[in-house]
From Swiss-Prot:
Protein name per its UniProtKB record: Ribonuclease HII
UniProt source species: Hahella chejuensis (strain KCTC 2396)
Statement: the UniProt record of this protein carries the keyword Hydrolase: yes
Known cofactor(s): Mn(2+); Mg(2+)
Cofactor binding note from Swiss-Prot or TrEMBL: Manganese or magnesium. Binds 1 divalent metal ion per monomer in the absence of substrate. May bind a second metal ion after substrate binding.
Organism taxonomic ancestry: Bacteria, Pseudomonadati, Pseudomonadota, Gammaproteobacteria, Oceanospirillales
GO terms (BP aspect): DNA replication, removal of RNA primer; mismatch repair
Length: 204
């Protein structure tokens, strides 16, 4: 596995800045919140195996999530709800979730590194890094925390809204999910601003 560049060696070797990695999960699903995380890693407590959460198994993500929570200097998550996604669109909701994650850090970073090409409004300097979750350890850590927390929420919602298969596909528009939507209807946890859900509501 390619070793990811740590926040310390890449960004703050000379200045000693505290750098937070920030990422979000859940832009594509038809159901559930978008979840973001922010992580400031501790250079004295390295974490082996950090990588883009999509490249890790469920078991690896869960184990790393626990290790990140135990070893990071600071971490926090932030959500944007289905209602917020429908009101302000998924891009703005993703940025809002990232804002909330950074605001939740118990230690204020000097710099935030954001996965992707959009930067939320923050109280500190920030830099966007395309595919940052595959390049920067702190962003990879954030992607893992966000993914694990969102998956746990979809597992919980699967119990409340049985029949949609949420625990399996995590809200993504799989054939099973679309079939269940047609048979069982749209729920309060479905994103009405998304086209497949809109079409069902319109009777198409």
């Amino acid at each position: 596995m390619k070793k990811l560049t740590s926040q310390i060696s890449l960004f703050d070797h000379e200045t000693g800045q505290l750098v937070a990695g920030v990422d979000e999960v859940g832009r594509g699903p038809l159901a559930g919140p978008v979840v973001a995380a922010a992580v400031i890693l501790n250079p004295e407590k390295p974490i082996e195996g950090l990588n883009d959460s999509k490249k890790l198994s469920h078991r690896q993500r869960v184990a790393l999530s626990q290790e990140i929570r135990e070893k990071a200097l600071a971490w926090a998550t932030g959500w944007a709800t289905v209602e917020e996604i429908d009101q302000i669109n998924i891009l703005q909701a993703s940025l809002l979730a990232m804002q909330r994650a950074v605001a939740g850090l118990q230690v204020a970073p000097d710099l935030a590194l954001i996965d992707g090409n959009k930067i939320p409004k923050l109280d500190m300097p920030a830099e966007a890094i395309v595919k940052g979750d595959s390049k920067v350890a702190a962003i990879a850590a954030a992607s893992i925390l966000a993914k694990v927390e969102r998956d746990e929420e979809l597992d919980r919602l699967d119990v409340i809204f049985p029949g949609y298969g949420l625990a399996g596909h995590k809200g993504y528009p799989t054939a099973q999910h679309l079939s269940a939507l047609r048979e069982l209807g749209v729920t309060d946890i479905h994103r009405r601003s998304y086209k497949p859900v809109q079409q069902l509501l319109q009777g198409d």
